[in-house]
């Protein structure tokens, strides 16, 4: 059977993409033996502000809960407050600072905190006594002795190698 070769004909219609969309398989990629179950009850932490507490610059017992040891305002993440509550607390703290109910910074705790942080990072520091003349004289005399001993050793080697 002979099949004749026909020349390649260009179609008059432009190339069309198929209208079929890509279908994802019905089965999930990985099957787990026990599916993940959400708890029935929503997990909600209680706010540190009670229903009767007024957020005011005079309410120092409430304000002190939201200030760190260094005297900084704690973040919302740590406080677990709503945005509105956090704003009110921040305003109250700033008012209390301006009216000198609160210090702007707690310097005593801050110094302790900085000293601890530095010692943890760098380790203990030892001071070098460089400017005491007696020590520098001792150091120089020791250096001179070392140099003279080394020169003697070198001379002895040279003499022994010449023989």
Curated annotation (Swiss-Prot):
<dbReference type="InterPro" id="IPR036870">
    <property type="entry name" value="Ribosomal_bS18_sf"/>
</dbReference>
<dbReference type="GO" id="GO:0003735">
    <property type="term" value="F:structural constituent of ribosome"/>
</dbReference>
<keyword id="KW-0689">Ribosomal protein</keyword>
<feature type="region of interest" description="Disordered">
    <location>
        <begin position="1"/>
        <end position="52"/>
    </location>
</feature>
<keyword id="KW-0699">rRNA-binding</keyword>
<comment type="subunit">
    <text>Part of the 30S ribosomal subunit.</text>
</comment>
<keyword id="KW-0150">Chloroplast</keyword>
<keyword id="KW-0934">Plastid</keyword>
<comment type="similarity">
    <text>Belongs to the bacterial ribosomal protein bS18 family.</text>
</comment>
<feature type="compositionally biased region" description="Basic residues">
    <location>
        <begin position="7"/>
        <end position="48"/>
    </location>
</feature>
<dbReference type="Pfam" id="PF01084">
    <property type="entry name" value="Ribosomal_S18"/>
</dbReference>
<feature type="region of interest" description="Disordered">
    <location>
        <begin position="144"/>
        <end position="163"/>
    </location>
</feature>
<dbReference type="InterPro" id="IPR018275">
    <property type="entry name" value="Ribosomal_bS18_CS"/>
</dbReference>
<keyword id="KW-0687">Ribonucleoprotein</keyword>
<dbReference type="GO" id="GO:0009507">
    <property type="term" value="C:chloroplast"/>
</dbReference>
<protein>
    <recommendedName>
        <fullName>Small ribosomal subunit protein bS18c</fullName>
    </recommendedName>
</protein>
<dbReference type="GO" id="GO:0005763">
    <property type="term" value="C:mitochondrial small ribosomal subunit"/>
</dbReference>
<dbReference type="GO" id="GO:0070181">
    <property type="term" value="F:small ribosomal subunit rRNA binding"/>
</dbReference>
<keyword id="KW-0694">RNA-binding</keyword>
<dbReference type="GO" id="GO:0006412">
    <property type="term" value="P:translation"/>
</dbReference>
<dbReference type="InterPro" id="IPR001648">
    <property type="entry name" value="Ribosomal_bS18"/>
</dbReference>
